[in-house]
Amino acid sequence: MGKEKTHINIVVIGHVDSGKSTTTGHLIYKCGGIDKRTIEKFEKEAAEMGKGSFKYAWVLDKLKAERERGITIDISLWKFETTKYYITIIDAPGHRDFIKNMITGTSQADCAVLIVAAGVGEFEAGISKNGQTREHALLAYTLGVKQLIVGVNKMDSTEPAYSEKRYDEIVKEVSAYIKKIGYNPATVPFVPISGWHGDNMLEPSPNMPWFKGWKVERKEGNASGVSLLEALDTILPPTRPTDKPLRLPLQDVYKIGGIGTVPVGRVETGILRPGMVVTFAPVNITTEVKSVEMHHEALSEALPGDNVGFNVKNVSVKDIRRGNVCGDSKSDPPQEAAQFTSQVIILNHPGQISAGYSPVIDCHTAHIACKFAELKEKIDRRSGKKLEDNPKSLKSGDAAIVEMVPGKPMCVESFSQYPPLGRFAVRDMRQTVAVGVIKNVEKKSGGAGKVTKSAQKAQKAGK
């Protein structure tokens, strides 16, 4: 078998009709985890419904519908393989909660694939002021997705078909735009494709002999290729933050007969080991970890990305809850945040937002109302330069530095230190009205918290 391939997470972004579903469906279909039987079933259904032309998108729609109905579908359906990687599509927009998911990120994307449509008038609609192309690309960059691939899709519907001139025009415009956001176009592969016909998806297209391939230049090494699949192979694999102190936001806490209290969550940074003395914030409880397990198997250590359950001694289910954060009591233990300074971008709010606004913030697994206590400055959302001090109010499209105060005890961190605990979505009126990254956190000096007997024992034993 050889060594298992590295796992990479991608997020697919772009305007609503750019062909994201068809392109993604095509990759999953040709390289993915969908078995022949399922594909034949989908094809038959698509044909019966007169949707033969949508078969790739249809695959994705079926998966999406199942995902939205809450049927936990086999996640392998969202995976496909390249020569180097196992790639998981962690989200595709069009999904209602796409923006929220991207931020509270069940997992952080290693790379964003931006699909733009080359068809007459389509590209213009997508990149216009109110098109989603800009918003998605800006979001991806703000939330720390620093690698980008651009697929110029629907090359079969340019005038004339497969037009080199049209492709060059789009590359020029998208390059200028992503550069404004912060991406360096020299490091971004641009690939002309047809997600429907399959041009340049997996192998070079005979329809575009003028396309000599894409090239990227970067300090980690240059790369070149022709197809979209090859471009995915140039993604730089993430370095997992094992060297940082432990941060594990709790998703749930269970009481299991004969075992006791078992918090469950995903290790975001650092390493969790049995025997470790951990502190939970903001509740300020310190105790010993008895055992750690994943998929019902005991682990000697859990690493970033692992979803684990762990058994803690002398702590009741009433003491800790979803949204609490677990960390190593001896290495930068997590603490309650008294207040924090954030850079926020207002996405869609019908009115004006002024100081005193108290929406719900979704940050890691916490879901807590926070007050915009002070609007410190309005900034240019691309360059970050200050436009105005103490603005009276903010509206859609504005970016600002805001002082925020949690309405209930909460543990968050700065984005620079612990990215997954430093980005958040602002929810109001059942939608995401803003996104933010945390610049710095003023910690509450908690005084002495509760230290359980088992923690004292473990500390005495000098663990």
From Swiss-Prot:
Reaction equation(s) it catalyzes: GTP + H2O = GDP + phosphate + H(+)
Tissues expressed in: Brain, heart, and skeletal muscle.
Residue(s) carrying N6,N6,N6-trimethyllysine: K36, K55, K79, K165
Entry similarity comment: Belongs to the TRAFAC class translation factor GTPase superfamily. Classic translation factor GTPase family. EF-Tu/EF-1A subfamily.
InterPro entries named in the record: EFTu-like_2 (IPR004161), G_TR_CS (IPR031157), GTP-eEF1A_C (IPR054696), P-loop_NTPase (IPR027417), T_Tr_GTP-bd_dom (IPR000795), TRAFAC_GTPase_members (IPR050100), Transl_B-barrel_sf (IPR009000), Transl_elong_EF1A/Init_IF2_C (IPR009001)
Subunit record text: Homodimer; arranged in a 'head to tail' dimer configuration.
N,N,N-trimethylglycine modified-residue sites: G2
Natural source organism: Homo sapiens (Human)
GO CC terms in record: cytoplasm; cytoplasmic side of lysosomal membrane; endoplasmic reticulum membrane; eukaryotic translation elongation factor 1 complex; synapse
Enzyme Commission designation: 3.6.5.-
The name this protein goes by in its record: Elongation factor 1-alpha 2
Binding, Mg(2+): D17
Phosphoserine modification, residue list: S163, S224
Upper lineage: Eukaryota, Metazoa, Chordata, Craniata, Vertebrata
Residues where N6-methyllysine is found: K36, K165
Start and end residues of each stretch annotated as G1: 14-21
Renumbered residue ranges of the record's region G4: 153-156
Positions that bind GTP: D17, S18, G19, K20, S21, T22, N153, K154, D156, S194, G195, W196
Residues annotated with Phosphothreonine modification: T239
PANTHER family assigned: TRANSLATION FACTOR (PTHR23115)
Disease: Developmental and epileptic encephalopathy 33: A form of epileptic encephalopathy, a heterogeneous group of severe early-onset epilepsies characterized by refractory seizures, neurodevelopmental impairment, and poor prognosis. Development is normal prior to seizure onset, after which cognitive and motor delays become apparent.
Principal EC category: hydrolase
Record PTM text: Trimethylated at Lys-165 by EEF1AKMT3. Mono-, di-, and trimethylated at Lys-36 by EEF1AKMT4; trimethylated form is predominant. Methylation by EEF1AKMT4 contributes to the fine-tuning of translation rates for a subset of tRNAs. Trimethylated at the N-terminus by METTL13. Mono- and dimethylated at Lys-55 by METTL13; dimethylated form is predominant.
Single GO BP term: positive regulation of lipid kinase activity
Subcellular location: Endoplasmic reticulum membrane
Chain spans, region Disordered: 444-463
